Amino acid sequence: KYALTKFHLIDLALKGSKNPINEFIKQFKKDSYFKSVVDDIKKVKRLKSKSHLKSVKKLGMACSYPGTFNSSIHSIINSTNYKGAILKTIKAGGCNCSRVNFIGAYFAALKGINTIPKSWIRKTDSAKKILDQN
């Protein structure tokens, strides 16, 4: 259900929602399947004023659910853009790849592809180039 929630949040962002997280809570607050997810999001929102590093240590640094989801939500609600959210998440440590892939997709869906720093894109090798090395 946490993975499915990620898809819902990205879909809401792509459809123009200004706040997909609040929209998700509104749409699914009475859905028994998503009850634990909605409760977790509300719990994370109560931690908004806490540092991201401390929150990740409390919510979960591993790649398993619900920790990876909850820590991702904390980064999202405490960030205004792709770069800030990604850097904050990487600096928090743990299995940050499981969090960063969702956070990156979320902000790209919410704010558009141009939110990804061009300098980061230039430093990234294409999959084709990597595969052609063999």
Model-derived segments and spans:
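Catalytic phosphate/nucleotide-handling subdomain of diverse soluble enzymes
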Residues: 1-11, 67, 71-134
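Accessory "access/gating" subregions that flank catalytic or transport cores
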Residues: 10-93
